[in-house]
Swiss-Prot record:
The capsid protein forms a homotrimer, from which the VLPs are assembled. The protease is a homodimer, whose active site consists of two apposed aspartic acid residues. Mg(2+) 3 binds at residues 1610, 1652, 1685. Retrotransposons are mobile genetic entities that are able to replicate via an RNA intermediate and a reverse transcription step. In contrast to retroviruses, retrotransposons are non-infectious, lack an envelope and remain intracellular. Ty1 retrotransposons belong to the copia elements (pseudoviridae). A motif (Bipartite nuclear localization signal) lies at residues 1178-1212. This is Transposon Ty1-GR1 Gag-Pol polyprotein. Residues 1-16, 153-165, 402-418, 960-969 have a biased composition (Low complexity).
Length: 1755
């Protein structure tokens, strides 16, 4: 046992003759301290030899500097300075040693040590001598010193035995490492035994045989200090010496106790490795013995898992129990308990058979024969297994080497299976497995047979080109063959010892011989079917026999496991011995470099490369002859086998010889391709192909998914088709090992139909070459067809089907025939074929009207399978049809998007080619039938929606003809082509925008205004843009006739001299004097008549007053005016500097450049809504839109066909589609999994903290009785839908603590296991902000609490089970849940109901109606967020009483009691709050942002110029289609989700000034262009730069004891995609901003007034709810105000005139707003736009304006 570690000490200091103590392995029943006598003698001989060579030299120091190279001391060496008897401690050669102490005869054996300088040194007394022990029988004592020749005699026995000689006592080695202390103690104890001190050594019970004397104690202490320096002592030894420095006996006692424990562990390991059981003893006794051993090892830190334990038990089974090796060896999850159940069953059966029927149980050979017959109940499958399975893993390599050393006896029949070939594990000492090491499969030696090998048989291999065998007993005429080069699947050389003949004697008494190679380095004996075919022998897997070509059966084939075998009983044995074979071509090399060493030295290069390099002198220093190349032949480097593992080679043409065994359509190849992403739901994502082995005929079928039933439907279809059409039955189907083929449903189907499934090797595509090559060819054709035709990607399967039709008709270069000819079908009639994507005109048999055009443009796809028609794609109808009513069109270009309708002509060649087909149809037509033009019933792509979210009316809006288009052209086009658009985009048309939906030139050049709206500029006092519409001089509410000017966008200058215009008086929006603007003459306008209708946009009559408050009604009382003024008072509005009156500017000088992008600025993203839009008129009447939007008939326009570009390899993302697809921001995972936090965590300190948190969580779960610990359930007995997966998640909290949480996978929870009607409520953020605001105004105390493991207090009603935590080690068991585990769907609702009931019933609280998780009583308000509670009260004792009641039921922690009168800091739900009662409150997130933002990997610029605003006006997101690689796109989307997710969290908490930018960028998460990412980076940079900003609240000091709730509203008209408006609202309580909202209007508004009304109507419900909450929490009167900068909206609210409503929708919206304002007593007031802080919610603002509107409430 000690040999491995003791051998490390190759030298000993102080002139010791014995370098180390080497011993033989200790027998298990031997004393662990006993050492073989033979080894002792050997060591003493070595000591004698070493001492004889020593020379004595003077020493300059008593202590050697290097203990490993100490020089011997002379006789004049110094003695200890603090002892009065130096000579007794240091004897010279001339002094007589005391009897029994001859060890000190050599002066160098006791050096002078620093220990003796210590005042604690314990010297012997004046009269004490060194211990003298009488010589006892059998005690090896000293002999005369070989150096001095003197004889040292014992003084007590000198007279009786003067001539007796004694041997020297061997000294212990010097301790040099704490790790060597256990082995050193053993040698030290042996030293004491040899010194006649064995009686003082403690026994197993810790007590010595006799008492130790003082002299012996002195000797023990001194020798221990000399040979065990303190710096090399283990910690536990130092701890003992620190208490009592002389307590060496205690050290020895503990050491012996440890050695005894180690001996027991070693005995248990050896016993477990050498188990034997044959039924001679009761099975209960055997089970008890094994389980006790396993339990002891597990308790001592040696973990034996189930798999290893089962392996060890099965290896020891013999007799009738041996068959369990074969039946159980493939059960991966087998447990020891299950294995013993089988053993008990056999034992009981064995006992019963002995009493009744002696032959009741079959022998093992019968079992094996039965198993073979059972496995052959299904059709066999052709296999092509790797002949070198040993190269697949390291374990298989070890197995191969074991086989090479075994001697296999020749097997003559199948009964050889019963012969045991296993060897027990030889673990002879404990060092084979250290303490704490887990016993795994690698520890167990492999047998000389593979786990899946059938002993006594040859493996049939169709992929092996040569036959290889391990045993030499069947090789005839063996000879060496150094020239043969055989490689395995990894292209590594297989060493071949010999070549010979393998002779068969088959059952028809015929003999056959084939060549065989001998090698011991393979896992199976391989029989090559190629070599059998060379001697006219083939394997028929339909009959399971080897047969000749004439049908003569030679031998049966046996299926075992996944392979097919032939018995070795048909082999003729030879007389060649194993050593003869193994020594063939083996030469002895002497004094040469071993090849494995050179192989590793030269980077694991192969032998051929190394030899070639040495021959050419590219490597110097040694030659080729210096290397022993004999081992290079059979050397297998395990590292190379693992690192360079490849797939096995496939022999070209190896399958051809078996094709003749099958008739057409009996052997099929199949494979599935897919999925194809980014397609409509109606288009298929997969296709499945079939290829006949003999005829190479191909079929393809579309699939939308890979479910079992979908695959089964296709198999049913094709089998029925082959049976009915070709009168053939499919026998074998070859496929890969995908789950769609290996599922039980398909397996049963094939078995029922008598079809053999032939599976290929996993991940071996070359073995499935026929199907794989077909899919690759079809995909190449598909891409080519789509590229050539320009058709959209969703028609990809039509291209596949077209290619399949053509490929079946093309001749094969090998067979010179086509697949159709092989199948007996006629050739393809090319007159019925059209080019893929050929433009055609299809007759519309059901037009909308009689004057509607009858032709619909379309594109030919492929011939129909169900009729004589053709499948044609109609873009305008978004579907495919099966029809014969079409006319072929052919142009100069073949690309779909390059066709020019005017240039289309009939192609003569195509017409001539198809003439015969059309004449055939014409001759057989009796009358025109509209029934032929039907939608294809078979086609999967009928009624395809090109994009599920694309508006259907967009496609009908095309660009109208330009002014330069001649009228005649327009007329001709309308005659030729239907008004309906003839095409549809591939995904979403990238050109769908205002530029091609609306006539951009005319519309953009004329800012049309039918009347003046005072709110167009939000109440500005001047108008900076000319109004180019003629206006009436009167003050009526009627709109005048509007004129539209021609395009002057490209003009360089525009002045009064160039146009004739008249001045029109216009009312200023700010109430200033009327100004005049030029009117464009009629000659330069396009006249359009607009019906007069009542206008709601005109401003109401108003006086020239500077008063900015417009009341709802017009009372003249002073009290009403004071109320309205009080609403404005105390609001954080900006202070505007007074403006001097200015002249109205020249409108044409300040006219902004007109750009089509400004017409809908936010179509591209953040638009310019402030620079010009807010001062321009934002109106456009509904009638104007209807007049301007015209539908183009030029549907073949090149520009509009651009969306049908050919497919590209990159992902194409359109802006509008991406914006519409965004529903919500995907939450980003911030937690760690178990493997991330513990298993692979390289941070040791963090890992330890997570482990501590893990155990803390487990203890808490057990404490809360989360599951039933009394009963464990078997997984098979429980309904799977009631089993919930679980996992541990870890995270680091903001306070630095590490948290572990055991959660359930509620995301995959079955709907039947929870009540979907239950709600998990938490406090609304507005409720929390309202409570905080009221607390500040009323001097409330704020207390923060936390309830540990809150969910676990709630019981669970449903019957649910989870898998136990990993540390329990019960993977196959389930436990029933009793508590609401975190992660379950119902846990949140259960906890809410539990805590709600307790607060109401036990704490006297009541929940505020409409505001969940807000509880109150007369003194306390509670806001609940899961397990966090915030308490508000006027009296702190009220909070304490609630806390005491909570602690009675729940584990409640007080995070912050809030009793101080100074500033208190809180961390409440992510908000960092600084609160001083009665003064102020500051809300921010500086610490959190400082920690989180750097982790986002955003390129921050801390030293650069800081951004002053989150965005600037005039920025547009480019609308060009984005093209990205798939992986790059996913990565950028994921990055956007992280960045916008953090920004949203911050914005909705307190940074309401950023909500507009966050909302706009959130709509572009799925459009991660560089521009969008840059804008997002700028937003994050701005948040980083302003992370120290806080939302500032000050205590309000109202004149009256009332609460004032105000909402400020604003809207930006038409600045979002699809002309949606952006609306924003800010809510203030007593002058403090408590919330904000910025969102895109759900409906499209037709004017600014509509947008403003929509914004106000969106704010009123929340305003009323907040009002109710405030009244419940604070019993004060409340005043509600609504502020807007739209005077038109105010006029509608106060007016009773319903004639202003232009339509029913607008009228109902306005009337509802009137009712809400009057019914809820809202005070509607006007506010100037410059003071409207809600403006930051609706548009990007200049830096100065942004700061002006926000610096009073956030800074």
């Amino acid at each position: 046992m000690e040999s491995q570690q003791l051998s490390q000490h190759s030298h000993i200091s102080h002139g010791s003759a014995c370098a180390s103590v080497t011993s033989k392995e200790v027998h298990t029943n031997q004393d662990p301290l006993d050492v073989s006598a033979s080894k002792t003698e050997e060591c003493e001989k070595a000591s004698t030899k070493a001492n004889s060579q020593q020379t004595t030299t003077p020493a300059s120091s008593a202590v050697p500097e290097n203990p490993h190279h100490a020089s011997p001391q002379t006789a004049q060496s110094h003695s200890p300075q603090n002892g009065p008897y130096p000579q007794q401690c240091m004897m010279t050669q001339n002094q007589a040693n005391p009897s029994g102490w001859s060890f000190y005869g050599h002066p160098s054996m006791i050096p002078y040590t620093p220990y003796q300088m210590s005042p604690m040194y314990f010297p012997p007394g004046p009269q004490s001598q060194f211990p003298q022990y009488p010589s006892s029988v059998g005690t090896p004592l000293s002999t005369p010193s070989p150096e001095s020749g003197n004889t040292f005699t014992d003084s007590s026995s000198a007279d009786s035995d003067m001539t007796s000689t004694k041997k020297y006592v061997r000294p212990p080695p010097m301790l040099t490492s704490p790790n060597d202390f256990p082995n050193w103690v053993k040698t030290y104890i042996k030293f004491l035994q040899n010194s006649n001190l064995g009686g003082i050594i403690p026994t197993v019970n810790g007590k010595p045989v006799r008492q130790i004397t003082d002299d012996e104690l002195t000797f023990l202490y001194n020798t221990f200090q000399i040979f065990a320096p303190s710096q090399f002592l283990p910690t536990w030894v130092k701890d003992i010496l620190s208490v009592d420095y002389t307590d060496i006996m205690k050290i020895l006692s503990k050491s012996i106790e440890k050695m005894q424990s180690d001996t027991q562990e070693a005995n248990d390991i050896v016993t477990l490795a050498n188990l034997q059981y044959n039924g001679s003893t009761p099975a209960d006794a055997f089970e008890t013995k094994v389980t006790n051993i396993i339990d002891r090892l597990n308790n001592n830190g040696i973990h034996i898992n189930n798999k290893v334990a089962c392996q060890l038990i099965m290896r020891g089974l013999s007799g009738e129990y041996k068959f369990l090796r074969y039946t159980r060896h493939r059960h991966l999850n087998m447990t020891v308990a299950e294995l013993f159940l089988d053993i008990h069953a056999i034992y009981e059966e064995q006992q019963g058979s002995r009493n009744s029927k002696p032959n009741y149980r079959r022998n093992l050979s019968d079992e094996k024969n039965d198993s073979r017959s059972y496995t052959n109940t299904t059709k066999p499958k052709v296999i092509a297994r790797n002949p070198q399975k040993t190269n697949n893993s390291k374990s298989k390599t070890a197995r191969a080497h074991n086989v090479s050393t075994s001697n296999n006896s020749p097997s003559t029949d199948n009964d050889s299976i019963s012969k045991s070939t296993t060897e027990p594990i030889q673990l002879n000492n404990k060092h084979d497995l250290h303490l704490g090491q887990e016993l795994t499969e690698s520890t167990v030696n492999h047998t000389n047979h593979s786990d899946d090998e059938l002993p006594g048989h040859l493996l049939l291999d169709s992929g092996a080109s040569r036959t290889l065998i391990r045993s030499a007993h069947h090789i005839h005429s063996a000879s060496s063959n150094p020239d043969i080069n055989v490689v395995d699947a990894q292209k590594r050389n297989i060493p071949i010892n010999a070549i010979g003949d393998l002779q068969f004697h088959f059952q028809d008494n015929t003999k056959t011989s084939i060549k065989v190679l001998h090698t011991p380095n393979i896992a199976y004996d391989l029989l090559s079917l190629n070599e059998l075919a060379a001697v006219d022998i083939t394997a028929c897997f339909t009959k399971n026999v080897l047969e000749r070509s004439d049908g003569t059966v030679l031998a049966p084939i046996v299926q075992y496991g996944d392979f097919y075998w032939v018995s070795k009983r048909y082999l003729l044995p030879s007389n060649i011995s194993v050593p003869t074979i193994n020594n063939v071509h083996t030469s002895e090399s002497t004094r040469k470099y071993p090849y494995p060493f050179i192989h590793r030295m030269l980077a694991h290069a192969n032998a051929q490369t190394i030899r070639y390099s040495l021959k050419n002198n590219t490597i110097t220093y040694f030659n080729e002859s210096d290397v022993d190349w004999s081992s290079a032949i059979d050397y297998q480097c395990p590292d190379c086998l693992i690192g360079k593992s490849t797939k096995h080679r496939h022999i070209k043409g190896s399958r051809l010889k078996y094709q003749n065994s099958y008739e057409p359509f009996q052997y099929l190849h199949t494979d599935i391709f897919g999925p194809v992403h980014n397609l409509p739901k109606s288009a298929p994502s997969y296709f499945i192909s079939f290829t006949d082995e003999t005829t190479k005929f191909r079929w393809v079928y579309p699939l939308h998914d890979r479910r079992e039933d979908s695959i089964l439907d296709v198999f049913t279809t094709i089998l029925a088709f082959i049976k009915n059409q070709f009168q053939a039955s499919v026998l074998v189907i070859q496929m890969d090992r995908g789950s769609e083929y290996t599922n039980r449903t398909l397996h049963k189907f094939l078995e029922k139909n008598g079809i053999t499934p032939c599976y290929t090797t996993t991940a071996d595509s070359r073995a499935h070459g026929v199907a794989e090559r077909l899919n690759r060819t079809l995909l190449d054709d598909c891409r080519t067809q789509l590229q050539c035709s320009g058709l959209p990607n969703h028609l990809w399967f039509s291209a596949i089907e077209f290619s399949t039709i053509v490929r079946n008709s093309l001749a094969s270069p090998k067979s010179k025939k086509s697949a159709r000819q092989h199948a007996g079908l006629a050739g393809l009639d090319i007159s019925t074929l059209l080019p893929f994507g050929q433009p055609v005109i299809v007759n519309d048999h059901n037009p909308n009207s009689k004057i509607h055009p009858r032709g619909i443009p379309g594109y030919a796809l492929h011939p129909s399978r169900n009729s004589y028609g053709y499948i044609i794609y109609l873009p305008s109808l978004k579907k495919t049809v099966d029809t014969t009513n079409y006319v072929i069109l052919q142009g100069k270009e073949s690309r779909l998007d390059q066709f020019n309708y005017d240039a289309l002509t009939f192609d003569e060649d195509l017409n001539r080619l198809t003439a015969s087909y059309h004449s055939f149809i014409a001759s057989n037509e009796i009358q025109e039938s509209n029934d032929l033009n039907i939608e294809s019933d078979h086609d999967f792509q009928s009624d395809i929606e090109l994009h599920p979210e694309q508006p259907r009316n967009v496609l009908s809006k095309a660009v109208s003809p330009t002014d330069s288009t001649p009228p005649s052209t327009h007329t001709e086009d309308s005659k030729r082509v239907s008004k309906t658009n003839i095409r549809a985009p591939r995904e979403v048309d990238p050109n769908i925008s205002e530029s091609n939906i609306l006539p951009s030139k005319k519309r953009s050049s004329t800012p049309q205004i039918s009347n003046i709206e005072s709110t167009g500029s939000g109440g500005m006092h001047k108008l900076n843009v000319p109004l180019l519409a003629p206006m009436s001089q009167s003050n009526t509410h009627e709109s005048s006739h509007a004129s539209k000017s021609k395009d002057f966008r490209h003009s360089d200058s525009y002045s009064e001299n160039e146009t004739n215009h008249t001045n029109v008086p216009i009312s200023s929006t700010g109430g200033t004097n009327n100004k005049t603007v030029p009117q464009i003459s009629d000659q330069e306008t396009e006249k359009r008549i607009i019906h007069r209708s009542p206008s709601i946009d005109a401003s109401p009559p108003e006086n020239n007053s500077s008063h900015n408050i417009v009341p709802i009604k017009t009372p003249t009382t002073v009290s009403e005016q004071n109320t309205e003024e009080s609403i404005i008072a105390d609001l954080p509005l900006p202070d505007l500097p007074p403006e001097s009156p200015t002249e109205f500017p020249d409108p044409f000088k300040e006219l902004p450049p007109i750009n089509s992008r400004q017409t809908n600025s936010s179509l591209g993203g953040i638009g310019d809504s402030n620079a010009y839009t807010t001062i321009n008129s934002k109106k456009r009447s509904l009638e104007d839109n209807e007049t301007e939007i015209k539908v183009s008939r030029d549907t073949w326009n090149t520009k509009n066909m651009r969306s049908l570009e050919p497919p590209r390899s990159k992902k194409r993302i359109h802006l509008i589609a991406a914006v519409k697809a965004v529903k919500s921001i995907k939450p980003i995972r911030t937690t760690l999994r178990y493997d991330e936090a513990i298993t692979y965590n390289k941070d040791i300190k963090e890992k330890e903290k997570y482990i501590e948190a893990y155990h803390k969580e487990v203890n808490q779960l057990l404490k809360m009785k989360t599951w039933d610990t009394d009963e464990y359930y078997d997984r098979k007995e429980i309904d799977p839908k009631r089993v919930i997966n679980s996992m541990f998640i870890f995270n680091k909290k903001r306070d630095g603590t590490h948290k572990a949480r055991f959660v359930a996978r509620g995301d995959i929870q079955h709907p039947d296991t929870y009540d979907s009607g239950m709600q998990s409520n938490t406090v609304h953020h507005y409720a929390l902000m309202t409570s905080l605001s009221l607390a500040l105004d009323n001097n409330y105390y704020i207390t923060q609490l936390d309830i540990s493991s809150a969910y676990l207090y709630a019981d669970i009603k449903e019957e649910l089970y989870i898998r136990p935590p990993p540390h329990l080690g019960m993977n196959d068991k389930l436990i029933r849940l009793k508590k609401s585990l975190y992660g379950l769907k119902q846990s949140g609702a259960n906890w809410y109901e539990t805590i709600k009931s307790y607060l109401i019933q036990q704490c006297g609280m009541e929940e505020v109606r409409g505001w969940s998780c807000v509880f109150k009583n007369s003194q306390v308000t509670i806001c609940l967020f899961v397990d966090d509670m915030v308490l508000f009260s006027k009296n702190l004792n009220s909070n304490k009483r609630i806390i005491d009641k909570l602690k009675m039921q729940y584990d409640t922690k007080i995070i912050n009691l809030g009793e101080s009168d100074e500033e208190i800091q809180y961390d409440i739900l992510g908000l960092e709050i600084k609160y001083q009662r009665g003064k102020y409150m500051k809300l921010g997130m500086e610490n959190s942002l400082t920690e989180k933002i750097p982790k986002l990997n955003v390129p921050l610029n801390p030293k650069g110029r800081k951004l002053s605003a989150p965005g600037q006006p005039g920025l547009y997101i480019d609308q060009q289609e984005l093209e990205l690689e798939e992986d790059d796109y996913k990565m950028k989307v994921h990055e956007m989700q992280k960045l916008i997710g953090l920004a949203s969290y911050v914005g909705y908490k307190f940074r309401f000034d950023l909500l507009y930018y966050i909302n706009t960028l959130a709509q572009h998460i799925l459009f991660p262009s560089k521009q969008v990412l840059d804008m997002t980076y700028e937003l994050i940079q701005f948040i980083w730069n302003t992370r120290d900003k806080q939302l500032i609240w000050h205590k309000s000091k109202p004149v009256k004891p009332t609460n004032k709730l105000v909402v400020i509203s604003d809207a930006s008209y038409g600045n979002q995609p699809y002309y949606k408006s952006q609306i924003g609202n800010i809510y203030l309580l007593n002058g403090k901003v408590i919330g904000g909202k910025s969102t895109k209007a759900s409906l499209t508004c037709t004017s600014t007034t509509e947008a403003e009304i929509h914004a106000i109507s969106e704010s009123v419900p929340l305003l009323n709810n907040l009002s109710y909450l405030i009244q419940e929490l604070d019993k004060k009167p409340i005043t509600k105000g609504l502020l807007t900068d739209s005077k038109s909206t105010i006029s509608i609210i106060i007016s009773n005139n319903e004639e202003k409503f232009r339509n029913r929708f607008f009228g109902t919206k306005a009337m509802r707003l009137r009712d809400e304002v009057s019914g809820n007593h809202l005070h509607v007031c006007y506010i100037e736009t410059k003071k409207n802080i809600a403006d930051v919610m609706t548009k990007p603002l200049p830096i100065k304006t942004f700061k002006l509107l926000t610096n009073k409430w956030i800074h």
